[in-house]
A protein has these predicted regions:
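Alpha-helical segments in soluble extracytoplasmic regions
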Residues: 52-67
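N-terminal intrinsically disordered, cationic/polar leader segments
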Residues: 1-53, 82, 87-119, 125-140
């Protein structure tokens, strides 16, 4: 059996790409930051310590998920035509990586908000490359 040569521009079918994963993970980072902020200032019990440890672990895992999702889309999906139309995508992707790292390193809620805003802009650009209209809504 002879296999014909095939060509593809990415590792997986493009239909798999969706920045929604990064958006959900970024929102989760903010939620975990909020929950960490609600913890008592002084941890007295093993139960509270275990809870805080789990919250921090989950915050960090979701920040990593943001980075993985954005890196995959940026590295595998964006090609020259999209980059020409949206030249900010390189700086934005790098900024998302740095902001996600800040979220891992600290518990400042503003870092989480910044991450959500940057990931939302990334998603907006992604969908614009597919000529899909998006809209932004403020939460209540």
């Amino acid at each position: 059996m002879k296999i014909r040569d095939v060509k593809a521009h990415c590792d997986i079918p493009c239909a798999v790409y969706d920045p929604g994963v990064a958006q959900y993970a970024a929102l989760s980072v903010v939620r975990f930051l909020d929950l960490i902020g609600e913890m008592p200032e002084n941890i007295d019990s093993k139960k509270d310590l275990a809870h805080l440890t789990r919250l921090v672990q989950q915050k960090e895992e979701h920040a990593i998920e943001v980075k993985d999702a954005v890196r995959t889309i940026w590295g595998d999906y964006f090609k020259e035509p999209q980059m020409e139309k949206f030249p900010e995508i390189h700086e934005l992707s790098h900024s998302i990586m740095m902001t996600a790292s800040k979220c891992k390193q600290d518990i400042d809620r503003q870092n989480g908000i910044d991450l959500v805003e940057k990931v939302n802009r990334f998603a907006e650009i992604f969908w614009a490359t597919k000529e899909v209209k998006t809209e932004t809504k403020k939460s209540l």
